[in-house]
C-alpha cells in the first residue's frame, strides 16, 4: 500500500508543478482537468502524510521500549503504542476507501428524468414533489438545474420532466437515485380519507461528451412541431420544438423548452447521447459479467428503491434498510443522509470485492 501511496505522491507533485506552467494555464480545458486531478490527489496525499506521521511515532515508541529501563517511561510508551495502533487501523481504512477506483462517471453532469408511474393524477403530483426535492437539493449544493422538457399532469405535477444538472460530482452524488420511488398518502382528491399508493420513476444518466458517444446523424430522424402547454394547447406558432428518433435503437427524445429550434435541438441531442451511452454501457457490463447482485441495486429504473410514507412521516430506502423519520425535511431536499449511507454501502461492497480478488 505504501508503494502505491508513494506513486500517488509523485504524481501529485507532477500535477502541482504542471498547473503553474503558463502554457498549461492558457489551455483552459487542460488546466481544468489538471486542477480537478490535483484536488482528488490532494485528499489522498494529506491522509498519507498523517499515516506516515503515525508510522514514525510507532517506531519512536518501539525504540523507547527497546532501550528505556524506567518503568514509568516504558508504561507511557506502551499506552502510546496502543493508541497509535488504533489510529493506524482507522487511517488505513480511510486510505483503502480513498484508493477504491472511482466510477469514471462520478464527476460528470447528469440528465435527470422523472416520470409519474402507477397511480394516475396522484403519481404525476408525486413526480412534481420529487422534482422539487431534487431542485432544493441542487440549490443547497450550488448546482445549476436547466429544464429540457416537461409534460404537466392534469391535476398538477408532471407526467414527465427532464432536466440537466451541472456542478461538482453531480453523478457521483445522485446516481443512486435511479429507480422507482413509492409514495403512501391520502391524495387531495380522496374524499374517504383512504391512503393510496402511487409511484414515480427516476432515471439519472451521466451527461456524455461528443467524444464518448459517436452518433451517426444519418441514423437520427428529426421532426419539428409547435410547443404545447398544459392540455395540449399551442403556446408557440413557430415549429421550434424538436423530436429526435434514433432509428437503430428506437430511442425517442423531444425538447420544447426553448424558443429557439437550434437550442432545443442541442438539448435533445444531449439527452439522446446520454440515453444511447446508458444502453451501450449496460450492454457492455452484461457482456463482461460485471452486473453483480448488488445490495444497493443495479441502478435500473425499474428497481423499487424507496418509500415515502406521509402518515408516519417516514422515508425508507429498501436497498440498505435505512429509515429517516422526518419526511418534510427529506422532501425539502435534505437527502444527504441517504446519499452518504448509499455511498458507504457501495464502498463496503467494493472493498469486499477487492479483498476477495486478492485472496
Swiss-Prot record:
GO terms for molecular function: translation release factor activity, codon specific. The keyword Secreted does not apply. Methylated by PrmC. Methylation increases the termination efficiency of RF1. Its main location: cytoplasm. GO terms for cellular component: cytoplasm. Keywords: Cytoplasm, Methylation, Protein biosynthesis. Peptide chain release factor 1 directs the termination of translation in response to the peptide chain termination codons UAG and UAA. Belongs to the prokaryotic/mitochondrial release factor family. NCBIfam families: prfA, PRK00591.1. This is Peptide chain release factor 1. The gene is prfA.
Amino acid at each position: 500500500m505504501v508503494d502505491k501511496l508513494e506513486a500517488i505522491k509523485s504524481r501529485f507533485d507532477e500535477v502541482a508543478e504542471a498547473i503553474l506552467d503558463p502554457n498549461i494555464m492558457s489551455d483552459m480545458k487542460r488546466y481544468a482537468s489538471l486542477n480537478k486531478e490535483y484536488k482528488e490527489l490532494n485528499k489522498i496525499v494529506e491522509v498519507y502524510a498523517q499515516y506516515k506521521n503515525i508510522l514514525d511515532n510507532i517506531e519512536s515508541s518501539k525504540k523507547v521500549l527497546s532501550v528505556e529501563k524506567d518503568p514509568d517511561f516504558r508504561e507511557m510508551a506502551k499506552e502510546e503504542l496502543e493508541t497509535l495502533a488504533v489510529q493506524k487501523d482507522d487511517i488505513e481504512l480511510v486510505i483503502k476507501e480513498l484508493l477504491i477506483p472511482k466510477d469514471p462517471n462520478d464527476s460528470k453532469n447528469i440528465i435527470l428524468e422523472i416520470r409519474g408511474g402507477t397511480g394516475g393524477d396522484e403519481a404525476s403530483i408525486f413526480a412534481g414533489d420529487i422534482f422539487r426535492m431534487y431542485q432544493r437539493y441542487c440549490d443547497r449544493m450550488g448546482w445549476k438545474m436547466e429544464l429540457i422538457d416537461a409534460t404537466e399532469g392534469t391535476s398538477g405535477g408532471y407526467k414527465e420532466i427532464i432536466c440537466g444538472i451541472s456542478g461538482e460530482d453531480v453523478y457521483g452524488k445522485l446516481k443512486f437515485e435511479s429507480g422507482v420511488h413509492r409514495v403512501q398518502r391520502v391524495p387531495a382528491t380522496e374524499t374517504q380519507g383512504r391512503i393510496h399508493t402511487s409511484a414515480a420513476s427516476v432515471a439519472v444518466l451521466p451527461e456524455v461528451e461528443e467524444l464518448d458517444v459517436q452518433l451517426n446523424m444519418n441514423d437520427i430522424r428529426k421532426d419539428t412541431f409547435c410547443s404545447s402547454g398544459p392540455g395540449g394547447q399551442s403556446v408557440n406558432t413557430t415549429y421550434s420544438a424538436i423530436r429526435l428518433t434514433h432509428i437503430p435503437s428506437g430511442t425517442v427524445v423531444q425538447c420544447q423548452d426553448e424558443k429557439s429550434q437550434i437550442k432545443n435541438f442541442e438539448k435533445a441531442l444531449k439527452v439522446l447521447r446520454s440515453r444511447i451511452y446508458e444502453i451501450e454501457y449496460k450492454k457492455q457490463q452484461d457482456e463482461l459479467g460485471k452486473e453483480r447482485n448488488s445490495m444497493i441495486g443495479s441502478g435500473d429504473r425499474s428497481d423499487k428503491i424507496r418509500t415515502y410514507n406521509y402518515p408516519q412521516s417516514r422515508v425508507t430506502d429498501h436497498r440498505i434498510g435505512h429509515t429517516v423519520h422526518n419526511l418534510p425535511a427529506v422532501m425539502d431536499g435534505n437527502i444527504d443522509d441517504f446519499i452518504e449511507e448509499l455511498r458507504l454501502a457501495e464502498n463496503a461492497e467494493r472493498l469486499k470485492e477487492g479483498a476477495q480478488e486478492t485472496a
